[in-house]
Structure formats: structure tokens, C-alpha cells
Amino acid sequence: MPPDLIATYTKDLNIELFGGKELLETFHFFTKEGGLFRADEYLVTGGDYQYYLDVYSVGCTTEDFYLEHGSDLLDSGINQQDLVNTLLELDMEDELTTKRIGRIAYKDFNFYELDGTTVTAKQIKSAVIDNDFRGAGLASNIYRMLTEKHDYIVCDNVQSIAGGSLWASSILTIAEVRIYDINKRKFVDVLGRRGRGINGFVPWSCQTLTADQILEWGRSYSHDTCHHIVNVISKDSLFDI
């Protein structure tokens, strides 16, 4: 709910989440910055959240081959799914160098659409990416993938500066981002540049940030708490690639 911004947070990717888990689906995607990735989606029972997504960098028996060959295929105009299928059909994964580099945790979140119907979205509660892969184009691919499957994705009510910046920049490049007021049960604006809605609504607050951290944020912010506000993207609002 954009949220109060906090300076940062850290989580250990090697810690297994509490609760029983069931594998729901496995996705693959490719980026020119990072190569081939796999994402395993789990349903969790008895844990803090209902779902989580483990993200892996897929190793190759020939170093950098996935990255180089995939980039060539991408430059040729091939679509993402055909590119991924081509790389997987080569059967060149090196399981010893495949490693977990990210984890996204999320839960069900209900809100009202413009026509008054109740919609169940997935609200992101934690998004952690290994430092070595934070420039690998993962976030936009993962959020697009989750939106295509679950129809609606909603941000958390507390975000790190990096998490808020993700929604205020990268997410804007993949979809229209609508601003929703939980108390009023309606959408109040559409997010534009610099952390401000196109009609002037500001969906972020900085209650606990220092002056230096507010400078690091570098965008508009509200002096009033924004715990009742969320940013929402939907499958229908995704931009064509």
C-alpha cells in the first residue's frame, strides 16, 4: 500500500520458508542482461504467506552460451517463449551452477474493480534479488509473468526505497499502474512519473526516512501516512512487448 517507505531490508535466500509447500508451476524466461532463468511457484500452507516464487539463474555446460545464443536469438526478433524453448531443447543445463538468486512472497488481496465487482489479486509481501542480479532485468519479467497468470498484482504496504523505486520506474514500463484507496474502495488516480499520479495524487509517504534517505528516494511523497493506498497492475493493462 504505498506505503510508508523504509530505508532497506535484508533477507537470507538460503532460509527455507515455514510451512508445507506444493509446486504449482514452473516458468522460464530470458534477459539480455542475465541470461536464462527459472521460476518455481509454490502454494504454502501454515506459513506467513500463501504463495512464493523461487527464482534461479540457470547454469550452462558451456559458460555464457545461454546468454550469448539467447541474445542473438532475441536480436533476430524471436518471441520470448520460442527463445526459451529453443534454449531448453538444447539440454545444456549445468545443475551444479544453477543457483537460487531471488524469492518473491505474496498473498491474496481483495479489492473492488471499477464496475463494483470484487477482485482477488496477489499482493507482493517480499521481493528479494541477489545483489549480483539486480541489474539483470528480472523484476519487469517476473511481475509481467505473475500478472499474466494471476490477472492482478498489488504492491505491499511497506516498501524499501528500492521497492518503491521499482514501482515508480520499471513497473511503469510494463503496465498502467492504477492507485487504489482501500478506505474509499475505489481507484483514485493513475501513477505517472516522479512518484505522482497524473492528476496529482501522491501514493507514497516517508514517515521513518531520514533527510538523506528522502533525497535518495528523489520523488514526490506525502506528509500523511499512505497505509490505505495501494498500486495495482492488471493483465488488461500490460503493454505490448
Question: Where do the protein language model's features map onto the residues?
Answer:
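Non-catalytic substrate-recognition and accessory regions of acyl/acetyltransferase enzymes
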Residues: 1-130, 144-154, 164-168, 172-241
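Glycine-rich acyl-CoA binding loop
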Residues: 134-146
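Short, basic-rich loop-to-helix N-cap that marks the start of a DNA-contacting helix
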Residues: 161
